[in-house]
A protein has these predicted regions:
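Short, solvent-exposed beta-strand/turn "edge" segments of beta-rich domains on protein surfaces
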Residues: 67-73, 130-134
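Acidic-leaning, charged glycine-interspersed low-complexity segments
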Residues: 93-159
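Short acidic, glycine/tyrosine-flanked loop/strand segments centered on an H-E-D-like triad
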Residues: 75-88
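Generic short beta-strand segments
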Residues: 64-65, 83, 144
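Residue-level signal for secondary-structure boundary sites
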Residues: 70, 86-90, 147-151
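Extracellular structured ligand-interaction cores
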Residues: 57-59, 75-77, 136-140
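Ordered, soluble secondary-structure elements with a strong preference for glycine-centered loop motifs
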Residues: 4, 89-96
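Small/polar-rich, solvent-exposed N-terminal microdomains that initiate assembly or binding
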Residues: 1-70, 154-159
Length: 159
């Protein structure tokens, strides 16, 4: 549950960071150019593709990938995956620009704390794939968050 709340808060931050960033989309059949739109921010994974649906690109996926809990704290690794579309061979730069906006939003968090409870650890990592599925481009960001581990309440304590 804590991980879901973390990714929800992170999706809100990401959505605010990219909301005014117009990126190209795949042209629909019969059109020379696609429309420009901000990346959709999605929890977890892209939904299965159905016939007749618009292309998913551009997008930003936010998902908790792994975690570890000890007595005092929980560490959660969250991936932020950026996908863009461009028929130009410098299309990977769209991914870098989206990543830069997200990174700026993350590094601007007061005290590196999101929603008053999730502490961002540095470094923020990112990587691209050597082989990109042209004309689609992808970049992966890796963030690590510290959360205070919920403590059990002793039923015999009187509050």
């Amino acid at each position: 549950m804590v991980e879901n709340k973390l990714t929800r808060a992170l999706r809100e931050l990401v959505a605010a960071a990219v909301k005014n960033f117009a990126l190209p989309t795949k042209p629909e059949r019969g059109f020379a150019e696609g429309e420009l739109r901000a990346p959709q921010v999605v929890s977890g994974y892209l939904p299965p593709k159905r016939t007749g649906q618009k292309d998913d690109f551009p997008f930003v996926l936010v998902r908790a990938d792994e975690g570890a809990t000890d007595q005092d704290s929980t560490e959660v690794k969250v991936s932020i995956i950026v996908g863009t579309y461009s028929e130009e061979y410098d299309g990977h730069e769209y991914c870098l620009n989206v990543m830069a906006r997200i990174r700026t939003a993350l590094c601007s968090l007061p005290g590196m704390v999101l929603a008053n409870r999730y502490r961002l650890q540095h470094p923020i990592k990112w990587s691209t794939y050597a082989e990109q599925p042209y004309p689609y481009w992808q970049l992966d960001m890796q963030t690590t968050w510290d959360i205070r581990t919920p403590q059990p309440i002793d039923k015999e304590e009187d509050f």
